[in-house]
Amino acid sequence: MYVWFEAVMGYYSASIHWAKNQGKPDEWKKWWENEDSEHYYFMAKDNIPFHTIIWPAMLSGCGYKLPYDVPANEYLLLDSSQFSKSRRHAIWIPDYLDRYDPELLRFYLASIMPEQKDANFTWEDYVTRINTELIGNYGNLLYRVMSFATKNFPEGLTSQNPVNLELNEKTKKAFDKVSRALEACKFKKALQAIMELSQAGNIALNDAAPWKQVKADREACETTLVQFLNFCSSLSVLMSPFLPESSQKAWDYLGKDSKIEDLGWNSALDHQDSFELKQPLPLFTKLNMEEILEKEMPPEETNELANVKPEVTFDDFKKLDIRIGTIEKVEEHPNADKLWLLDVNFGGPVKRIVTGLRGIYENDDLLGKKLSLI
């Protein structure tokens, strides 16, 4: 059976197996026989034909719902070369999770996603993006607002004017942009829109300067903070598809008693006029470039071979029966395109040898040549 016929059947058979394990043997039909279901298949570009030709043909023959979208990406490289398990040129997820926050990797991979062209993973870029974009832009804004609010208004905050009109308009535009990008599986574009909105929030916060307002007009400062807390709420919802754990953590700090994953997507546009915050902690910890490069950079290449067997002695070498022969005849192998049949004279009976040199040497190149045989 052709491997790509059997492989894609795993989508279907796994769902049946899952349904049986749930004690609901017909539950799989909700996806495969439901006209309202939408199938998405995420992969690299080399697997496109199997999911756009072979798999749809199989589904059509069975009368099942066809794929809705096949959002294939270009390649993700590691230090400008392809990942390879055999060469140990890879990032091993268990090792990564032992050392780092998984949400950092989610953010980084989404930010460099190879949607239009190959992308390159480097540890230097990983640290730089996490520190400057995720922490310096997004994480810093949320922590600045929440920590300042809890420090200066520990009893809670209330305002009859909870919406900053300029920020609210930018949030609506970003919400539309993020929504369209996610629906089109353009995750990098969606994340970029969120980060642009966060940067706009940082600029607006610096302009509002609540640290100055609190000294001159506490009521105005309270209104400013309520507006920015609502803005942080919107950011948390928008970021939740990318960073579910830290988004929920921020949601909890904002005094919410719900789960973001249970909310509707439109809750990103909701506002409230009062907050009772919990004492926040920074959502992320800044990375140390030197420490990470020391841990993650591959060791310098060496010419030493691992597990080399000891050399044989000359006495052992003399025991080998090595004979020199002359190629007298070359024929094509009747059943293989890459093999030659060689008749070789070693000074006695002519030996027939099969060799994989066809395609490398022509017939005339081999005739009369000498070779050694053990």
Where are these regions (language model features)?
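Conserved, charged catalytic cores of large soluble enzymes
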Residues: 17-28, 142-178, 198-217, 299
